Amino acid sequence: MSIEKAHRMRAIKCPTDELSLTNKAIVNVSDFTEEVKYVDISPGPGLHYIFALEKISGPELPLGHVGFSLVQRKWATLSINQEIDVRPYRFDASADIITLVSFETDFLQKKTTTQEPYDSDEMAKEFLMQFAGMPLTVGQTLVFQFKDKKFLGLAVKTLEAVDPRTVGDSLPKTRNVRFGRILGNTVVQFEKAENSVLNLQGRSKGKIVRQSIINPDWDFGKMGIGGLDKEFNAIFRRAFASRVFPPELVEQLGIKHVKGILLYGPPGTGKTLMARQIGTMLNAREPKIVNGPQILDKYVGESEANIRRLFAEAEEEEKRLGPNSGLHIIIFDEIDAICKARGSVAGNSGVHDTVVNQLLAKIDGVEQLNNILVIGMTNRRDMIDEALLRPGRLEVQMEISLPNEQGRVQILNIHTKRMRDFNKIASDVDNNEIAAKTKNFSGAELEGLVRAAQSTAMNRLIKADSKVHVDPEAMEKLRVTRADFLHALDNDIKPAFGAAQEMLENLLARGIINWGPPVTELLEDGMLSVQQAKATESSGLVSVLIEGAPNSGKSALAANLAQLSDFPFVKVCSPEDMVGFTESAKCLHIRKIFDDAYRSTLSCIVVDNVERLLDYGPIGPRYSNLTLQALLVLLKKQPPKGRKLLILCTSSRRDVLEEMEMLSAFTSVLHVSNLSTPENVLAVLDDSDLFSPEELQSIARKMAGKRLCIGIKKLLALIDMIRQSEPHQRVIKFLSKMEEEGGLEMDRVQGH
């Protein structure tokens, strides 16, 4: 909009050829204040032309005069010494942002032409470097010098713009406008003028379809990303929304652009894929993608120099153009390789520390850059130096977690799209059903599942005898069916954050035998704890201690509760996996299991045989205090918001845990009883199918009135041993073994 009243001035020739290449109106520095950067030139009623100003001092441009080049005078229909009205002009916050400008391009002087190729991509970069912030009007002609080649004449053909007030809308649309201002990220296209001999090359030549810089309505299906809609939109809001506004408005608001994003989460969830799409979404310069370990070098100082080289181009452009500089994106994959916490890496070279220091200085140092965006990716956020994570550095930290069911459907749709397009997938395959069965699968594991199903389908059409033969009608016959997916799910692909089915099945090798009311009550109480852990109103953490005498079946009951919970993530923390571990290694192993559990929405951890985990020995007594303190902390630590964790611990020494003040860490304690009545034992014997009804009656008569106490595990082992003896000796053998094992007292209890 025009501001202040008009100055009556006189149009003259541009003082020098160099100034004419700026395509600006040249005025004396005393004619306008420093704040005035644009002017509205009016040579007559109803005629208005917007120019950028270049202020110079010296006698070559007298006060009250405006210098125009020949090209500018032709466009604005100005004659030398013509009086014109000149008003200061300011672009306000609602001014259109030019997202695309198309030029009709030809040699400025038709007599001096060349067949030398002009790289349109390099021309677009150079144009933005020279003219970012320049107002353009449809029909305006500019003089453009590209490197040391012939001068070009650029006539503005079309301008596409978006209103910055609509950026937050779900569908901001671009529209053609008459004039506006270009920014450092405007897409520049060059179209060869009719009958021109100009040799244009590159992607910025002619009309090409390219994404606008502002595109919040990102189509994840086409880009090959599924299940990350919320994360992608959050990143756009935090990191990119401020970059679509004019530099002057950003300066007035005092905004500092976000310079860094950290994407972290389990392996295979799409962090690298997402970073790649962020680069293409912005339509900025081609992002620089660097693997963390590539930065490290064997020569002293080279690692730091590699960091400096990544930022060199952005530094040069920042010095030349200041706030009008375009955006430079640098993507670090596996950033934990170079940004470990300082002082944590052994050795006296300190290479890792100096690399972190160099990166900190470049992102947010004394001479800070405002035209960069650093995207780091890692699955070990805990290893990264905390100074790198504060605001001003990698301040937007987005967890790319395991996809939910809706996200898994999107991912499966992406990976089965081509099969559906070419009718290579059977009609019985339902992605919604597969998504429901693949709890806690990452995106990479779902892709692996599709590949495994395809290989199963292809294998049906291969006949392998002495030679390998492929069915000649394979092209027509090949269909991937639901059975192929289920086979891959059962046999080929297991999620890294899924249930530890094999370990649970080992603990439940004999199943659960309901030998009496104590078992029923314990399972009911255990299921109440499971429901408590699942409940939305619960605190998110439920820990249960299942204690009882040795061989009473505690581990099997804990495994059974873990299976009945139907939690997608179930892990067993067993002393068997930590034989020979040092105390610190044991603590790290336990902590990793808990850290993995926090990544799943519903998790269950079975901590088997707690006293063995603590290295408890009764002679001494001796135990590992380091492991004890680690367990106490983890048993009480609340999982992240929105996550639920059920911890099932087993122990044969309640008295020891009480002395260690560990019982208070549990939400509830369940006691597992031994078998204590003849009816209990007979229920187990009946379930074993070892004795005939008559033999069971004989055993019942012999045990009547006797004192009993035996663990279910020991009783089952005894039954397995008796099974190997002669049938006619089994009853006598069983009773004698029961007495030997101390489970049965043969002295009759005298009644009172």
Swiss-Prot record:
Protein's job: Required for vesicle-mediated transport. Catalyzes the fusion of transport vesicles within the Golgi cisternae. Is also required for transport from the endoplasmic reticulum to the Golgi stack. Seems to function as a fusion protein required for the delivery of cargo proteins to all compartments of the Golgi stack independent of vesicle origin.
Keywords carried by this UniProt record: ATP-binding, Cytoplasm, ER-Golgi transport, Hydrolase, Magnesium, Metal-binding, Nucleotide-binding, Protein transport, Repeat, Transport
Tissue expression remark: Nervous system and secretory tissues.
Subunit structure: Homohexamer.
Cofactor: Mg(2+)
GO molecular function: ATP binding; ATP hydrolysis activity; metal ion binding
Pfam family name, one: AAA_lid_3
SMART domains: AAA, CDC48_2, CDC48_N
PROSITE patterns noted in UniProt: AAA (PS00674)
The reaction(s) this protein catalyses: ATP + H2O = ADP + phosphate + H(+)
Superkingdom of the source species: Eukaryota
Keyword Chaperone tagged: no
The family this protein is said to belong to: Belongs to the AAA ATPase family.
Lineage: Eukaryota, Metazoa, Ecdysozoa, Arthropoda, Hexapoda
Assigned GO CC terms: cytoplasm; Golgi stack; presynapse
Keyword presence, Repeat: yes
Binding site for ATP: 510-515, 550-557
GO annotation terms (biological process): Golgi to plasma membrane protein transport; intra-Golgi vesicle-mediated transport; liquid clearance, open tracheal system; neuromuscular synaptic transmission; neurotransmitter secretion; open tracheal system development; regulation of synaptic assembly at neuromuscular junction; SNARE complex disassembly
Protein localization: Cytoplasm
The enzyme's E.C. designation: 3.6.4.6
Cofactor note: Binds 1 Mg(2+) ion per subunit.
InterPro entries, per the entry: AAA+_ATPase, AAA_lid_3, Asp_de-COase-like_dom_sf, ATPase_AAA_core, ATPase_AAA_CS, Cdc48_dom2, CDC48_domain_2-like_sf, CDC4_N-term_subdom
Protein name from the UniProt record: Vesicle-fusing ATPase 2
